[in-house]
Regions:
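Extracellular repetitive beta-rich solenoid segments
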Residues: 1-24, 30-33, 54-59, 68, ...
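Glycan-recognition and processing domains
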Residues: 26-48
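Short glycine/threonine/proline-enriched tight-turn/helix- or strand-capping micro-motif at secondary-structure
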Residues: 47-63
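A short beta-strand element within beta-rich, extracytoplasmic domains
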Residues: 70-81, 133
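Exposed aromatic-hydrophobic patches
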Residues: 116-124
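A short tyrosine-centered beta-strand micro-motif
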Residues: 129-131
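Short, surface-exposed beta-strand/loop patches at domain edges
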Residues: 136-199
Length: 199
C-alpha cells in the first residue's frame, strides 16, 4: 500500500507475474486545512438529494471502503425538514466475507423542532478495509442523501434495472454486534449522506 494506492499482483498461470496500481483512493486526498465533509459511500461528485427515514425500530445499513489509514474526528448529518428526533449513527467493521460485524463507534445527534447540519464528536481510526454505516432515528425524518447514481451497487436482483443500495433491519437501538440475519434489501433508493470530518 502506497498512500492509498493498492498494488495488485496476478499470476497468469504460465509463470508470468503482473503488478498494477489501483488508483482508487478512499477517502480522496484533500489540501491542508480542508475541514469539509467526506461522505462515506459517495462514489462520484454530484448534487445530493433527500431521503425519507422511517423512525422507530428501523436501522439502515450500507457499506463503504477505506483504502488508506483514516482518522475520523466528527460525524454529521443534515435534516432538510424540521423535526424532533435523536439520530444514532454507528460504524461497524466487517467479517472476512464482508458482512457487517462489530460496532466500533457510535454517536447520537439530537434535534428539537429544527433542521440543518448538526455534528457530534466521533474519534475513530480506521485501517484499510470494508466497513458498514448504520443509522436509525427515533422519529421519521428527511435527510440529505446520496442519489442512486452515486451510490455503491451492492447487488442487482435478477439482473434487473435497480441495484441494492442499502439494507434494513428491525432494532430498538444500534446493536453491539450486527445481526446475522433479518436484512431486507432496498433497491434503487438514495442512501443517507453521513459526513465525516477527518483528522
Amino acid at each position: 500500500n502506497n498512500q492509498g494506492k493498492i498494488l495488485k499482483v496476478k499470476d497468469d498461470g504460465s509463470g508470468l507475474t503482473y503488478a498494477s496500481l489501483d488508483q482508487y483512493i478512499s477517502p480522496p486526498p484533500a489540501v491542508p486545512g480542508d475541514t469539509n465533509f467526506w461522505i462515506a459511500g459517495l462514489l462520484n461528485a454530484t448534487t445530493l438529494t433527500t431521503k425519507t427515514i422511517t423512525g422507530g425500530s428501523r436501522t439502515y445499513w450500507w457499506p463503504f471502503v477505506v483504502t488508506k489509514k483514516t482518522t475520523i474526528q466528527t460525524v454529521a448529518i443534515n435534516l432538510t425538514a424540521s423535526a424532533t428526533t435523536t439520530v444514532s449513527i454507528g460504524v461497524y467493521d466487517s467479517t472476512e466475507q464482508g458482512y457487517p460485524n462489530a460496532l466500533l463507534k457510535s454517536a447520537n445527534i439530537s434535534y428539537s423542532s429544527e433542521s440543518g447540519v448538526k455534528t457530534a464528536s466521533f474519534s475513530l481510526s480506521l485501517a484499510p478495509g470494508v466497513y458498514w454505516l448504520a443509522m436509525r432515528s427515533s422519529a421519521g425524518i428527511t435527510v440529505r442523501a446520496i442519489p442512486v447514481g452515486a451510490c455503491m451497487a451492492i447487488r442487482t436482483p435478477s439482473l434487473g434495472t435497480a441495484s441494492v443500495t442499502d439494507y434494513l433491519t428491525s432494532d430498538s437501538s444500534l446493536p453491539a454486534q450486527a445481526p446475522s440475519s433479518g436484512y431486507s434489501a432496498e433497491a434503487g433508493q438514495p442512501v443517507p449522506a453521513v459526513g465525516f470530518v477527518l483528522l
